[in-house]
Amino acid sequence: MTSSSPNATKVKVAILLVNRQFIRSWIDSGLIKHLEANSNFEIHLFSDSEIHKRLPTSNDYKTVDLGEIQISKRTKHTVAMGLAQMSSRSRTFRFKLIRLFLPETLLFARHGNLRFKTVWFYKSFRRIIGNSLHNRMTLCYFFPPLRALINLYLKVLNEKPTLPKEISNGNFEWLIIPSASAIGYTTDFLEGANSIGLKTMIAIDNWDHLTGKSIYPIKPDYFTVMGKRCVEHAVQIHECDATRVLPFGLPRFDIYRKIEHNCNESFRVNKPRVLYCGFSLAHAEKQVVSSLANYFESRYGVGSIEVHYRPHPGPLPRYDGSTITNSNIEITSYKDLKRTAMPDMDEEFLNAILQADVVVGAPTTLILESLAIRKKCVLDLTNDGYHRTSAGNSALWHTHMIDLTDIKELPRGNTIDELHDQVDQMLQQPANCLHLDIENLYNTSEMLYRDQLLHFLLSAQHSKID
């Protein structure tokens, strides 16, 4: 590890954390400690009050409470208008706009008796009216004359976002902003940083951000993204300079680059195990999990194959009313998630994936994580007849999910029967692993994210890059 001399001036780096998940990605992962340990850097963590109270006490960095961060009106309108203007560049943007008005539920349920379908229609129609009233301003963004009036209003308003004085007066060389969703503070902070010549980096913390979470009216000096495919999305959707988009991976995914894969190694504890990974969007997955368990019990006998269900830690509401009544299904119960909103990526988390013979789920992050460590996976692409966002339909509308379904060798089930057959076939295969080419999405053979970031910052320090 390169170290500076005792008398060398340290590079001051400001890191802005305004999402609980970044505590896991940047602090719990050891990333910030790794940067600070280099001795070339002095790390300062800035956050709003809500996040600041959750930050652990450490000598590895200094923390600053910025209070409540206000977002400018210009940014609120500009980002929202951008989604409408750029909807032709990403299916996810279009689906996101559709879902602002149409509910998560289908207007007509495809299952149930007449009374159930009638009540379903009534509630879905009410949601359409409620959504339309709540998001009525978005309609203005679709019409150029109205956009022109809004832009004129914003010009007259003449807002000039500035950085908090704790950052602008801190003599920092870098402002790094981890980002996972469309939050307007990013644009305000980028504009404020540009006004004082502060170099900026947006560290994207997921794989769907550039395809559907936000737009960038003002771009940072650099992005870090999960993989090469994300670089392509940055160029094609956001018109970024490819040389400014760095495919370092994700801080929380470094754990998968540390695992040495062995095709002959089995992590099976007892019986063959199927793990179903829950979906964040509304999907009647409990019906799918129950059907898998019932299928294996009827085919091989009760208790012959374990079925484990790991719900998403932050799922959107489901409206189908399904419950799991089969007591043989093992359901993950999460500990207190108030601190980071996500489960710790500890040994228990890893073992949940490693000890499964087959991992099943919608095209979500956890499926990608399972593929990264060569687990046998099957995609759930079923449609439940209740939700607009059920797995099969979501896979057609989300650009990042299409990147996963484009891997033709990845087994999938478009119907419940197909899903049963595909999972059964994968269980019967003697191989413990599945080797698919996902390097364009996430490359496990690259250096750890924290090492790539460290090397980049050191190179920037020595070469004084812009």
Residue ranges and their predicted role:
Residues I27-D28, F253-R339, G413-T415:
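Conserved catalytic-core segment of nucleotide-activated headgroup transferases in glycan assembly
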Residues V64-G67, T332-K335, T340-A341, D406-E418:
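Short acidic-hydrophobic, aromatic-tinged amphipathic segments that line or gate anion-handling sites
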Residues T9-V13:
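Extreme N-terminal starter segment of soluble prokaryotic enzymes
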Residues A14-R257, G314-L316, L366-I367:
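Active-site and donor-binding regions of nucleotide-sugar-utilizing enzymes
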Residues P217-P220, T365-L441:
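Catalytic binding pocket for nucleotide-activated donors in carbohydrate/polymer assembly enzymes
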Residues E42-I43, I218-F223, E306, Q355-V358, ...:
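Short active-site oxyanion
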Residues I167-S168, G314-L368, I373:
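Donor nucleotide-activated moiety binding/catalytic core segment of transferases
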Residues N443-D466:
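C-terminal alpha-helical cap of glycosyltransferases
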